[in-house]
Design a protein with these regions (language model features):
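Hydrophobic positions within alpha-helical membrane elements
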Residues: 9-11, 121, 147
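Conserved non-catalytic scaffold segment of RNase H-like nuclease domains
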Residues: 1-87, 133
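Substrate-recognition/cap helix-loop segment adjacent to the acidic, metal-dependent catalytic center
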Residues: 90-111
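Acidic, Mg2+-coordinating catalytic module of metal-dependent nucleases/exonucleases
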Residues: 83-89, 95, 128-167
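Amphipathic alpha-helical interface surfaces
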Residues: 63, 67-74, 92-99, 116
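Short, flexible loop segments at boundaries between secondary-structure elements
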Residues: 108-128
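Intrinsically disordered, low-complexity terminal extensions
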Residues: 35-37, 44-45, 70-76, 98, ...
Length: 167
């Protein structure tokens, strides 16, 4: 699964704004939290993230508990244990895991880490990536772009089912 989050990090907390998750089979999940405090957002987040969110009446707006439950169901609907990939995903994984409280609350059927797509791209020899799409910094747009970047990297440096380079 390829994902992205948008969040507000004001120095002592990280608040989820939105999350987009894309499966290799084309399924998608998108949600916007009803619980973030927009007044904590810096100018960059207001201009580049909050301005792109759907209207508050859109069904993507959900409480964190609903986002947590729906994201878990989405990620575990298929066969096997899910694998998460993100581009510079350290904060993404923290804000994702915080949906369950602390790291100990993360369900056992979800990964304890996110695979780093930017590092994979570097190891694959920095192949030419797809153009950054219009609407970037929308979590779902960025998650879709992460899948496209992964496919480019797989052509340059294929991985086997265990995640090892297969050349």
């Amino acid at each position: 699964f390829f994902y992205d989050t948008e969040f507000i990090a004001e120095g002592s907390t990280i608040e989820l704004v939105s999350i987009g998750i894309v499966a290799e089979d084309g399924r998608e999940f998108y949600a916007v939290s009803t619980e973030f405090n927009a007044s904590n957002a810096n100018e960059w987040v207001r201009e580049n993230v909050l301005s792109k969110l759907p209207r508050a009446s859109h069904p993507a707006w959900k409480p964190l508990q609903q986002i947590r439950d729906e994201a878990h169901a989405f990620l575990t609907a298929g066969r096997g244990k899910p694998e998460l990939w993100a581009w510079v995903g350290a904060y993404d994984h923290v804000v994702f895991a915080q949906l369950w409280g602390d790291m100990a609350g993360l369900p056992k059927d979800l990964p304890r880490y996110t695979r780093e797509l930017k590092q994979y791209w570097q190891m694959a020899g920095r192949p030419r990536l797809p153009k950054v799409p219009d609407g970037n910094h929308d979590a779902l747009v960025d998650a879709r772009h992460n899948l496209r970047k992964f496919r480019v990297c797989m052509e340059a440096l294929p991985l086997d089912a265990s995640g090892a380079a297969s050349r």
